[in-house]
């Protein structure tokens, strides 16, 4: 190995990064001094949040995450068997040598055997637009399956194409990809969750996850008393929203209705429009898995309106935040970030308004997670644990079984109490789950 070349590269990398810092750091200081707004604090974000977080992630990457090679090996064999079975079955109907992974071949097969029906699916609203006729992506194939029904022979063929593509991608990306990146100690260093495991029987794989973090942040930012009351009393926020959306008693809310209420909850906060909700992938899950009916854009608009009617103070905060962003061309977050909107066109006003509302919610939630990870990384030695990685608003760790009780107390404290904002009576809660691997977990009470 040419370590001399590596040393030379790393030295230049560090030297050039340092030179950049003097330039970029000065720009941040100048912006903080010259730009309007009391909440803008780029150097504070850098010093308090980003640099400590970078060190915590570096430590996690250095330690690595143990993966179960035998699990992924077995999964790879199973996927290869399914891929071969689907390829063989499809060759029977589409001809020898047919490649389900080739968009051109799939398009040719569909055009020759189902072309007129693709146009029918567009006209009946199962596809978004006529451009879908030229596509063979998953969404288009699923739209045709919905048109004909799952048990139709044509649907079974299309489902085999979908399964072939999915299994091939999973095999190449997740199984072979992970095994190819595994080091000699069975760790990788940057569903398959069962392949991410505790290294031995003396350790737990642990995940700490904020509960409904964005919604709690929205309640904190807006100080909406109705939302705050739901969280204080430990009620089900998604169930409450479903009652308001569908005008039904709580005991009559179906799993599909609660699921869609959850999508509306988070969709509004994530800056999604009613049209995006009506045309989103959750509609496939609602119809295919939960037996519900697809929404029209008008229905989605009605449900969004009902959600906001249930939380009027949140609605006013959203309106004020959006107005100020249009006026100022930026929005600040309570922890010092700023998002700029330098080019607001008439056609893009709606998008800008949604992003202005989404930014402080997402930014605060993200910063709280990063700060929690940083603090936990600094304290993990107290229970002989290691931070492995973070996913969305959760942190994964490796903890000795004998130290789980004291570790849980520290984790709950850092996630729920030792946070950088004053929650003003809104409980920020987390769930802790443990298991021998990421696929089989139980909650710690």
List PLM regions with ranges.
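Flexible, glycine/threonine-enriched loop-and-boundary segments that flank and lead into catalytic domains
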Residues: 175-189, 371-384
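Conserved catalytic core of nucleic-acid polymerases
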Residues: 55-62, 243-383, 387-390, 398-401, ...
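A common structural junction motif
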Residues: 413-422
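Short acidic, glycine/serine/threonine-rich loops at helix termini
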Residues: 111, 217-220, 440-444
């Amino acid at each position: 190995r040419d370590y001399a070349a590596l040393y030379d590269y790393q030295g230049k990398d560090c030297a050039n990064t340092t030179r950049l810092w003097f330039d970029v750091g000065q720009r941040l200081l100048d912006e903080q001094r010259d730009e309007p707004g009391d909440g803008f604090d780029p150097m504070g974000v850098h010093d308090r949040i980003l640099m400590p977080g970078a060190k915590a992630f570096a430590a996690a990457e250095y330690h690595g995450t143990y993966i179960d090679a035998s699990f992924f090996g077995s999964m790879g064999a199973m996927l290869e068997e399914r891929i071969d079975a689907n390829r063989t079955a499809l060759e029977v109907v589409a001809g020898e040598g047919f490649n389900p992974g080739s968009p051109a071949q799939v398009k040719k097969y569909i055009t020759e055997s189902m072309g007129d029906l693709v146009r029918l699916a567009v006209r009946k609203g199962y596809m978004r637009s006529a451009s879908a006729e030229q596509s063979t992506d998953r969404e288009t194939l699923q739209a045709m399956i919905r048109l004909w029904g799952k048990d139709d022979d044509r649907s079974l063929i299309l489902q085999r194409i979908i399964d072939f593509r999915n299994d091939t991608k999973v095999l190449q990306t997740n199984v072979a990809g992970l095994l190819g990146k595994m080091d000699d100690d069975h760790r990788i260093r940057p569903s398959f969750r069962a392949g991410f495991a505790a290294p031995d029987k003396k350790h737990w794989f642990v995940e700490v996850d904020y509960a409904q973090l964005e919604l709690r942040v929205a309640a904190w930012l807006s100080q909406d008393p109705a939302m705050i009351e739901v969280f204080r009393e430990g009620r089900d926020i998604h169930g409450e929203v479903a009652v308001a959306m569908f005008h039904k008693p709580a005991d009559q809310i179906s799993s599909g209705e609660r699921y869609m209420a959850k999508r509306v909850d988070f969709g509004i906060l994530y800056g999604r429009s009613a049209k995006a909700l009506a045309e989103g992938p959750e509609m496939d899950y609602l119809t295919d898995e939960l037996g519900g009916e697809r929404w029209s854009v008008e229905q989605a608009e009605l449900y969004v309106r009902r959600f906001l009617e249930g939380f009027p103070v949140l609605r006013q905060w959203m309106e004020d935040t959006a107005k100020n962003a249009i006026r100022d061309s930026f929005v600040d977050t309570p922890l010092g970030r700023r998002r700029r909107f330098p080019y607001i066109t008439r056609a893009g006003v709606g998008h800008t308004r949604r992003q202005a509302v989404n930014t402080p919610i997402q930014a605060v939630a993200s910063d709280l997670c990063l700060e929690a990870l940083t603090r936990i990384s600094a304290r993990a030695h107290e229970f002989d644990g290691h931070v492995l990685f973070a996913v969305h608003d959760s942190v994964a760790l490796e903890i000795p079984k004998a130290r789980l009780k004291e570790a849980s107390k520290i984790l709950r404290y850092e996630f729920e109490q030792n946070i950088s904002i004053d929650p003003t009576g809104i409980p920020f809660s987390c769930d802790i789950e443990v298991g021998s691997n990421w696929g089989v977990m139980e909650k710690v009470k």
